[in-house]
């Protein structure tokens, strides 16, 4: 594995029981890249991420993160933000306590926070504009505010790689804009970012690399090379209108193909 490669996936396959999710996936993501993964619901995108994190085992193949083989535990220096609706808080926890969870792998044998841990937590909360909620119960926050808390928790671990599964789903347009531009600023500082999203236009406008995924990789590369009607049709099994104006690419809503034709 090249020292400039953050993620390398070799001949990766995954099954749930007899249900084959995908087979023979190969992928390299270089350090410092901001890559978007797009595709329809149920296409295997989240499963691919879980394999990168070591949360589930592949049927076949290997995943390397920053030169190390991923086995049965998440690699260090990875921040992960799952889909908002997948996170449940049925026990009382403040914003500070939730974000402090991101520091646990830095605490050594004794799981007690020190002044440096608290400083880092306050710093990321300030950077994300939610320091005023530090002592609030997380369930009292709006969806957008909660999403910022989970982003803060991931950043508190001081990651080299940040993986986000639809971080702007279910939040208002301003929060979507703020989160995306915050991620862009992190990427400019050298953090490698992988973003699962349904927002093709945001990917086209801001990200240097996109991976179209549906039971495997359909295409990958620069958005201007990948976002073409034939590739998107294979990805979504739908006709997608692509409008180009200079460097700007706009995707209209996809219309499912008539399978009766």
Predicted regions and their residues:
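Conserved structural motif at the start of ABC-family nucleotide-binding domains
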Residues: 7, 22-24
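Helix-to-loop junction immediately C-terminal to a conserved catalytic motif
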Residues: 53
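Conserved ABC transporter NBD signature motif
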Residues: 61-78
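Conserved ABC ATPase "signature" region
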Residues: 100, 115-133
């Amino acid at each position: 594995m090249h020292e400039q490669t953050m993620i390398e996936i070799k001949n990766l396959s995954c099954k749930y029981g007899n249900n084959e999710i995908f087979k023979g996936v190969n992928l390299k993501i270089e350090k410092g890249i901001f890559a978007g993964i797009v595709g329809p619901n149920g296409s295997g995108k989240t499963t691919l991420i879980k394999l990168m994190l070591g949360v589930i085992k592949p049927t076949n193949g290997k995943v390397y993160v920053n030169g190390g083989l991923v086995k049965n535990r998440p690699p260090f220096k990875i921040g992960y933000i799952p889909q908002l609706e997948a996170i449940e808080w049925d026990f009382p926890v403040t914003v500070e306590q939730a974000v402090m969870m991101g520091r646990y792998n830095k605490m050594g044998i004794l799981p007690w926070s020190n002044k440096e841990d608290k400083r880092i937590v306050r710093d990321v909360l300030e950077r994300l504009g939610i320091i005023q909620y530090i002592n609030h119960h997380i369930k009292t926050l709006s969806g957008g505010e909660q999403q910022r808390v989970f982003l803060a928790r991931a950043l508190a671990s001081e990651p080299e790689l940040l993986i986000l599964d639809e971080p702007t789903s279910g939040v208002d347009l301003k929060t979507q804009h703020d989160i995306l531009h915050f991620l862009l600023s992190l990427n400019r500082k050298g953090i490698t970012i992988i973003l699962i999203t349904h927002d093709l236009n945001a990917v086209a406008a801001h990200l240097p690399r996109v991976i179209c995924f549906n039971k495997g990789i359909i295409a990958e590369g620069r958005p201007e090379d990948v976002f073409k009607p034939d590739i998107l049709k294979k990805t979504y099994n739908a006709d997608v209108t692509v409008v180009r104006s200079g460097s700007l690419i706009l995707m209209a809503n996809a219309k499912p193909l008539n399978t009766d034709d």
